[in-house]
Amino acid sequence: AVEAVGVEPGATLRGLARDNDHLLGETYHSMAAIRFGDYIAKISAAPLSDNVRALTGKDVGTVEDATMRDLVVEHFRDQGAEYQLRAQLCADLDKMPVEDAAVLWPEELSPHQPIATLRIPPQDAYSPARRVYGDDVLSFNPWHGIREHQPLGSIMRVRIAAYERSTRYRHEMNAQPRVEPTNIDAIPD
């Protein structure tokens, strides 16, 4: 749309402008770096099982408010999914800066290395109990990880305060205690 007024979109805007492709077929990247033991890395998750690889680039048509959620719920009702968790190690701080998360790290300098397989079983992904638990109880914060996976860079330092304020406000508004699961069994069915 910005092209219609004679403006060429920058890398950030191009990254935000998404096709209406199925979410489960996408490869997700951390963008910001994390500590990876004694190394620095960016993390990604790529479709691995045939069923989610088949969704890569699959246009889902017109997207309404609940379209993507409904597609994910429908998928997991009968099927699981596998994703390859990968690390891209920093090999050159000049070409792979930690402080500027907008810089894409060149794969020719450091290809993504598989580090784990995420296996997600079939499930009722949006039951009323899970919706309340996910929306009202849980909080997301990249700083919840272990020290060996500490977030790095300026954007991550800003996020620590922003996420803390956001979760505090949300828990107060929802009148929910702030708890973090320590076991998969804490997540309702």
Please place each PLM-identified region on the residue numbering.
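Active-site-adjacent core segments of small-molecule enzymes
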Residues: A1-D189
